[in-house]
Amino acid sequence: MPALEITIINKLGLHARAAAKFVGVAGRYPCQVRVGRNPESCVDGKSIMAVMMLAAGKGTNLHLHTEGEQEDEALNALVELINNRFDEGE
């Protein structure tokens, strides 16, 4: 089960469009994706409502972990999305 902590760096944080992109990437993989402000209270990373309820603004540290088939690929894709500022160019 790969896991890591990552900081939200885009200007608007994990707002609706960014959350939709996150869930879209997570949904491409068959593994379980969990995300949260701390490892003990992670939510389903494939649920748009759960991801939006994190209210993760710029500078928020999030814990990501994946488990199951293609877990490494899923984690890498989500890290790339976050590090690319959700492709919002800011």
Swiss-Prot record:
Pfam families: PTS-HPr. GO terms for cellular component: cytoplasm. Residues 1-89 form the HPr domain. Gene3D superfamilies: HPr-like. The active site is at 15 (pros-phosphohistidine intermediate). PANTHER family: PHOSPHOCARRIER PROTEIN HPR, PHOSPHOCARRIER PROTEIN NPR. This is Phosphocarrier protein HPr. It comes from Pseudomonas aeruginosa (strain ATCC 15692 / DSM 22644 / CIP 104116 / JCM 14847 / LMG 12228 / 1C / PRS 101 / PAO1). The lineage of its organism: Bacteria, Pseudomonadati, Pseudomonadota, Gammaproteobacteria, Pseudomonadales.
